Amino acid sequence: QLLSERLGFQPFFEPVNDNPYLEDFYSDMRSWAFHSQLYFLTRRLRIHKQLLEAEGSVVQDRSVYEDAEIFARNLYLQNLISPRDYGVYQDLYQILIALLPPPNLVVYLRASVDTLLSRIASRGRGFEASIPREYLASLNTLYEEWINSFTQCPVLIIPSDNLNLVAREAHIAQVVQLVQDRLMGKTEVTL
């Protein structure tokens, strides 16, 4: 939110509370993983349609790439989505990304599992309280693999364990400047 306000970009946020499967998913991942991921993918397509129709620049807090490359893949690797269902999901994903233009920049906020657990606790969403530490560790591993192989657009990686964009003005100012510099193609190297 703060980043979009400072940059004057229109924000598009992940519709967490809209997913009718999410609470069921966190209580029984095996039964609801495919349904939940398919919902997120179709919802993300709707958001991308809005992004394409929006005037000016936008900020999106979760991309279609993350849905498929991290969350759905993690569930498949944990045998929570069957190979048949995962194949259908991947077919749909590949069609979608072929039709969508890539973003101008991906900002990756790198965080440890401890930081993620702390942030989840501070949000106070009851359905997130039971997320296993191991699940977050698996997601983190897949995020690192994905971001290191992502080539569709420039990537800005920001370590965020000690980052506080809400309470520390210097942090938000620095991140805004980094984003503006990357979008404008400006890079300064200090040797």
What are these regions (language model features)?
Residues 18, 30, 37, 47-84, ...:
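Flexible phosphate-sensing "switch/lid" loops adjacent to ATP/NTP-binding sites
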Residues 5-44:
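Conserved substrate/cofactor phosphate-moiety recognition/catalytic segment
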Residues 12, 60, 105-107, 156-158:
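Hydrophobic/aromatic beta-strand patches that form the interior of the parallel beta-sheet core
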Residues 9, 100-105, 151-154:
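Short glycine-/polar-rich loops that comprise or flank the Walker A/P-loop
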Residues 16-19, 64-66, 111-116, 162-165:
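Conserved nucleotide-binding/hydrolysis micro-motifs of P-loop NTPases
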Residues 1-3:
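Walker A (P-loop) phosphate-binding motif
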Residues 118-191:
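NTP-dependent small-molecule kinase module
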Residues 70-144:
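A glycine- and Lys/Arg-enriched "phosphate-lid" helix/loop adjacent to the NTP-binding pocket
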